[in-house]
Amino acid sequence: MTTATGTKPKKMEAFKMERGVKYRDAAKTSVIQVRNIDPDQELLPKPSWMKIKLPAASAKIDSIKHGMRRHGLHSVCEEASCPNLHECFNHGTATFMIMGAICTRRCPFCDVAHGKPLPLDLEEPRKVAETVQDMKLKYVVITSVDRDDLADRGAAHFAATVREIKALNPECKVEILVPDFRGRVEQAVEILKQNPPDVFNHNLENVPRLYREVRPGADYKWSLELLKIFKQEFPNIPTKSGLMVGLGETNEEILEVMQDLRDHGVTMLTIGQYLQPSRHHLKVERYVPPEEFDMFRSEAERMGFEHAACGPFVRSSYHADLQAKGELVK
């Protein structure tokens, strides 16, 4: 599998993607017409609270990477350039990204590669289950790229992965972080009913006013409907969603989205700072100070969320096992 990071093609109509090629940076975002991303833009300097010292390489980090490579698997930690990778790998945890490492969407905030994906690896659910067993995990998060090329948008592959993990690791808790199953929401939930997870997660990402820029191809109401339908089918399974801040939204808009989530039955929330993966992605409009994250958490508690992890480096799967236990994560 190769990676393309080149500059914008001069004639977009003549540009044809090759199947299996991972398009990143300018090769990915230059065709998004919503907002002009200027690679020469002046970037905001990072404030003190956004500067962290990465831990040294460790045997655990190498072990997890080796385990992933050995089974031909992917972690969203690496593919999305997560800032918490070293911390999570050092703690022996990782979030598996199934259905390949090529996404059919090209969201300009995300560092996951875009392109024409390869066919599904039907052995992947078993490989994930075996890796979970090898790593002796008690809590695992499974996410995926968007697969708009599949009739069920990948729902059956999620269900198969949950089934295989549970069969081989009956004590392991499984959280799934799913895409929006565009146009197939009810069908997808019906498929997931066969092998329900312990936590159901779908990220809204940001506020509806900015959706066209931040999540081209997605729809705010569709995402809320997905969360609502799943909760109606499984009222006892926690539903969860995550937001990024610093993309130009206001705090008032974030609070409105939080209330929308509660109105649709969501009980768990994550809010973290957006970080620009490269100069070819949406720029950071603002670094939100820690005290504002504390405010979001307080408001979430007031609204009735059972758990809210809010902090600059919080991500959906960051210490997801602790989130599920209701412990403070920030």
Curated annotation (Swiss-Prot):
<keyword id="KW-0949">S-adenosyl-L-methionine</keyword>
<feature type="binding site">
    <location>
        <position position="77"/>
    </location>
    <ligand>
        <name>[4Fe-4S] cluster 1</name>
    </ligand>
</feature>
<feature type="binding site">
    <location>
        <position position="88"/>
    </location>
    <ligand>
        <name>[4Fe-4S] cluster 1</name>
    </ligand>
</feature>
<keyword id="KW-0479">Metal-binding</keyword>
<keyword id="KW-0004">4Fe-4S</keyword>
<dbReference type="InterPro" id="IPR003698">
    <property type="entry name" value="Lipoyl_synth"/>
</dbReference>
<dbReference type="Pfam" id="PF04055">
    <property type="entry name" value="Radical_SAM"/>
</dbReference>
<feature type="domain" description="Radical SAM core">
    <location>
        <begin position="89"/>
        <end position="306"/>
    </location>
</feature>
<keyword id="KW-0963">Cytoplasm</keyword>
<feature type="binding site">
    <location>
        <position position="103"/>
    </location>
    <ligand>
        <name>[4Fe-4S] cluster 2</name>
    </ligand>
</feature>
<keyword id="KW-0808">Transferase</keyword>
<feature type="binding site">
    <location>
        <position position="317"/>
    </location>
    <ligand>
        <name>[4Fe-4S] cluster 1</name>
    </ligand>
</feature>
<dbReference type="InterPro" id="IPR007197">
    <property type="entry name" value="rSAM"/>
</dbReference>
<dbReference type="GO" id="GO:0051539">
    <property type="term" value="F:4 iron, 4 sulfur cluster binding"/>
</dbReference>
<dbReference type="GO" id="GO:0016992">
    <property type="term" value="F:lipoate synthase activity"/>
</dbReference>
<dbReference type="InterPro" id="IPR013785">
    <property type="entry name" value="Aldolase_TIM"/>
</dbReference>
<comment type="similarity">
    <text>Belongs to the radical SAM superfamily. Lipoyl synthase family.</text>
</comment>
<dbReference type="GO" id="GO:0046872">
    <property type="term" value="F:metal ion binding"/>
</dbReference>
<feature type="binding site">
    <location>
        <position position="82"/>
    </location>
    <ligand>
        <name>[4Fe-4S] cluster 1</name>
    </ligand>
</feature>
<comment type="pathway">
    <text>Protein modification; protein lipoylation via endogenous pathway; protein N(6)-(lipoyl)lysine from octanoyl-[acyl-carrier-protein]: step 2/2.</text>
</comment>
<keyword id="KW-0408">Iron</keyword>
<dbReference type="GO" id="GO:0005737">
    <property type="term" value="C:cytoplasm"/>
</dbReference>
<keyword id="KW-0411">Iron-sulfur</keyword>
<feature type="binding site">
    <location>
        <position position="107"/>
    </location>
    <ligand>
        <name>[4Fe-4S] cluster 2</name>
    </ligand>
</feature>
<feature type="binding site">
    <location>
        <position position="110"/>
    </location>
    <ligand>
        <name>[4Fe-4S] cluster 2</name>
    </ligand>
</feature>
<dbReference type="InterPro" id="IPR006638">
    <property type="entry name" value="Elp3/MiaA/NifB-like_rSAM"/>
</dbReference>
<protein>
    <recommendedName>
        <fullName>Lipoyl synthase</fullName>
        <ecNumber>2.8.1.8</ecNumber>
    </recommendedName>
</protein>
